[in-house]
Swiss-Prot record:
One example of a Gene Ontology biological process annotation: maturation of SSU-rRNA
A GO CC term attached to the entry: cytosol
Species name: Latilactobacillus sakei subsp. sakei (strain 23K) (Lactobacillus sakei subsp. sakei)
Tagged with keyword Lipid metabolism: no
Oligomeric form and interacting partners: Monomer. Binds 30S ribosomal subunits, but not 50S ribosomal subunits or 70S ribosomes.
Protein's name in the database: Ribosome-binding factor A
Subcellular location: Cytoplasm
Entry GO MF terms: ribosomal small subunit binding
Amino acid sequence: MKHRVGRVEQEIQREVNDILLKRVRDPRVEGVTITDINLSGDLQHVKVYYSILSNLASDAEKAQKGLDKAKGLIRSELGQRIKLYKIPEITFEQDGSVRYGEHIDELLRKLHQDEAQR
């Protein structure tokens, strides 16, 4: 069963990325990238983790509102593209790992600059 969940997660991630690029025309979701999918074991709920190009909090809030607004369209498109008994309920969450990685990179850069100045 675990293997099936992994395959369905991959398929959902690929399709949601495609739907966001080709079907959703909301300018608030431009620059949104799906980074991870977490599907429940019973295939009823899916958390979609995303990142955005901008670091502004207002852009993150706009992207979240745009994704919440497009949730119905995305779910209906998934229903047409994926053969499942029931299409899972979708929840969008911003992926903080990308921002955390950028923060670590910045700290390392500062450390290397300090060492070079000595």
